Amino acid sequence: MAGRFLRGAGLHAEIFPDERIPGSYILAIGGAEQSHVNLKHPGEVFYEYLRRIANVADLAAPPGAPMRCLHLGAGALTLARYLQATRPGSEQHAVELERELLDFVVDQLPLPEGTDLTVYIGDARHEVAFGDVDGPFDLVVLDVFAGEDAPEHLATADFYAELLELLSPRGVLLVNIGDDPPLAFAKRQLGAVLESTPHAALLADASMFSCRHPGNVVVAARREPWPQEWTAALLAAGPHPAGVLTGAELRSFAG
């Protein structure tokens, strides 16, 4: 097990082997699991919500074609590894608040050979507005929310509008939201995204839509209409039981 103290967060980060899956490792921060990485097979994604995000990435461009992707909240760079494995030559950019975290992750869990990743250390919204982050991107992934204690300046309709402006014409914004029943925070974030575009979907384990369980939901939003064939593909891809809300059902869920 390797560890490092994150001065910005005031928490201890650890990376340790996942005994269930050979060649895999878990990143924990403050004792809570944050990321899972399979070094032997980076094209395999363990966490359910991230598998759903990866499934959208699979649909967003022809198979194997490189993409431009912006990761806001880097974690253990699991998705960056996935894109390099499935779309070699992708141009990737990551914004991470904790320099110590990113250094620790890359030192302990090296990126796949050939990974083209540019890293920006700072606040996600500040870097998007004033930094060197320049679109267009085929994917923008925001993965910083864990319920009501989320950074307020990131959980706004204005910020989602800024992120949508970074997309290529057929690009996708993906927002991971962890929440507890009755999913009030997740519903507010979905509503905030819908203020800027009606072309969106909500992805989750189907049981999450009852609002009786804690877990993650993923908002996927576009500037162009949501392809209905994507809904069928995502339902088939899982993880199962997969749920996808669009159109009137999506608006009703947002409230």
Regions found by a protein language model. Name each.
Residues 21-37:
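A short, structured beta-strand/loop element
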Residues 50-52, 82, 123-133, 138, ...:
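Hydrophobic, well-ordered secondary-structure segments
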Residues 89, 114-116, 170, 197-199, ...:
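A generic structural signal for alpha->beta connector loops
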Residues 6, 21, 40-169, 183, ...:
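The AdoMet/dcAdoMet-binding core of the Class I SAM-like
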Residues 151, 158-225:
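C-terminal substrate-binding/active-site "lid" region of AdoMet-derived donor-dependent transferases
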Residues 32-36, 145-148, 173, 180:
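A short, flexible beta-alpha/helix-coil linker loop
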Residues 22-26, 136, 216:
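A generic structural signal for beta-strand entry/edge sites
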Residues 1-18, 34-40, 58-59, 191, ...:
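SAM/dcSAM-binding transferase cores
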